[in-house]
Amino acid sequence: MIQSQTHLNVADNSGARELMCIRIIGTSNRRYAHIGDVIIAVIKEAVPNSPLERSEVIRAVIVRTSKELKRDNGMIIRYDDNAAVVIDQEGNPKGTRIFGAIARELRQLNFTKIVSLAPEVL
């Protein structure tokens, strides 16, 4: 469960290392975001000499959460960290590599480019 002011790791090589959630895209009174939700975030830590800079406002999609994800078949998936991938306005990732495992639910939400770049899909 990601809410406003939550810090997330970045799971790609876009140049950002840590994000802080500002807003959850969707309805106006939505409190929590889960895997596959798009958020507006600010970059808290960035790699030197990268195209993304600290305090830049960006869009990101959540790919891992510490809170359990329960599937329809009864399987429960929980990750060690909260992580997101930086995306552009069309939903394409800004980085060229994805680090770590991501959930299968992203394919159903039309983030196929992120799924194809990921080394492991759970």
Swiss-Prot record:
Q: Which GO terms describe its molecular function?
A: large ribosomal subunit rRNA binding; structural constituent of ribosome
Family membership noted in the UniProt record: Belongs to the universal ribosomal protein uL14 family.
* Cleavable signal peptide: none
Q: What processes does the entry annotate via GO biological process terms? A: translation
To which species is this protein native? Populus alba
Keywords carried by this UniProt record: Chloroplast, Plastid, Ribonucleoprotein, Ribosomal protein, RNA-binding, rRNA-binding
Superkingdom field = Eukaryota
TM segments?
none
* Localization of this protein: Plastid, Chloroplast
Q: What does this protein do?
A: Binds to 23S rRNA.
Task: Give the record's subunit note.
Answer: Part of the 50S ribosomal subunit.
Q: Which gene encodes it?
A: rpl14
Show the NCBIfam families listed in the entry.
rplN_bact (TIGR01067)
This chain belongs to the protein called: Large ribosomal subunit protein uL14c
**GO CC annotation terms, alphabetical:** chloroplast; cytosolic large ribosomal subunit
Q: Does the keyword Isomerase apply?
A: no
